């Protein structure tokens, strides 16, 4: 019932609306003067597993076109920012246009966008956006570091998009988005997932990667992982200590060393 209601009222034609104002006016709609499209609704239509697949594909394509800013190296929360709207969206409008949540990069939402892209198999786009979120890439030279203005070794909660300050980092050292960025890397791209004692491998690597190696220390033991592309492989396959398994998951034994080879299609 809830899913039908969402699809019938929240779909705006090319993306999902963020919500509605108290008077019923849509928020995050193509008819909105400000905040036409918001990333969170698009990302979670994928991550929830409840969005119509065709609609989610269209929505994420539109969000990529409208919210990913290659020049500033940011993924905006929404666009355009609130400025002159007669509707009151709340405290967010108190920020200047392009600052923090008001049309800048809200890094929590940006990490969800990366994970959603990876989940859809749009691995090159996921990696491109992840690279934008990686703080070290905002200080590639002295000029970039001077413009960014904050530490390139911690995650910024927000990055500005406003005129004259676009690309400048905001709040640092105090954001839960650091944990989400870690998950975007380890689970979203490398494809290493832990649920309870079960480890699952679903690599979603960019096309220019041949694979990777990793060492996982858990359950008082060590798991050495090699992921390789293989032309003969049609779907993900897993080998544990040289023996093939029937699935991409296994439960490590406490205190043991395990060698894992994950083969993915080339």
Give the label of every model feature segment:
Residues 1-266:
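Acidic, mature catalytic/reactive cores of soluble proteins
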């Amino acid at each position: 019932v809830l899913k039908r209601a969402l699809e019938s009222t929240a779909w705006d034609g090319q993306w999902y609306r963020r919500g509605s104002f108290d008077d019923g006016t849509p928020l995050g709609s193509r008819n909105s003067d400000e905040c036409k499209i918001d990333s969170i609704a698009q990302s979670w239509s994928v991550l929830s597993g409840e969005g119509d697949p065709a609609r989610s594909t269209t929505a994420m394509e539109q969000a990529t076109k409208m919210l990913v800013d290659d020049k500033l190296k940011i993924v905006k929360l929404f666009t355009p920012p609130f400025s002159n709207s007669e509707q009151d969206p709340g405290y967010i409008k108190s920020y200047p246009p392009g600052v923090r949540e008001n049309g800048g990069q809200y890094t929590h939402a940006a990490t969800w966008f990366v994970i959603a892209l990876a989940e859809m198999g749009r691995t090159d786009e996921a990696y491109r956006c992840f690279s934008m979120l990686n703080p070290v890439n905002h200080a590639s030279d002295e000029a970039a570091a001077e413009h960014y203005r904050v530490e390139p070794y911690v995650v910024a909660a927000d990055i500005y998009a406003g005129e004259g300050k676009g690309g400048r980092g905001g709040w640092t050292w105090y954001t839960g988005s650091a944990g989400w960025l870690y998950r975007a890397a380890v689970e979203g791209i490398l494809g290493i997932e832990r649920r309870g004692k079960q480890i699952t491998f679903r690599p979603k690597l960019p096309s220019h990667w041949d694979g990777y190696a990793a060492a996982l220390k858990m359950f008082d033991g060590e798991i050495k992982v090699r992921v390789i592309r293989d032309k003969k492989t049609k779907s993900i396959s897993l080998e544990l200590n040289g023996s093939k398994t029937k699935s991409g998951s296994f439960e490590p034994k406490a205190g043991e060393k395990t060698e894992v080879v994950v083969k993915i299609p080339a």
